[in-house]
Amino acid sequence: MDQEQENIIVLTDEDGNELEFEELDRVEVDGKEYAILLPLDDEEDEAIILRVEYEENGEEVFSHIEDDEEWEKVADFWQELSEEDGEEE
């Protein structure tokens, strides 16, 4: 499997539709793990942030962030991280 294919995640929405995302990054904020995902079929090119949790069997579960403050904190952290990465290149 090539590197690009490994970054593709397929999630199922509440209507049972499968949606493909490219995982851009994973970050940890306040002891919680978050995935930064870019919808592959979206024309807007806007990333989404989902909380990553693990079931007892180790399976990943992606959850929407309901708290605006939590979402802002993660978004700000990722933006700062992205800007730092851009400066290094």
UniProtKB/Swiss-Prot annotation:
Please state what the protein is called.
Answer: UPF0473 protein Helmi_02360
Pfam families for this protein:
DUF1292 (PF06949)
InterPro entries, alphabetized? UPF0473
Family, per the entry?
Belongs to the UPF0473 family.
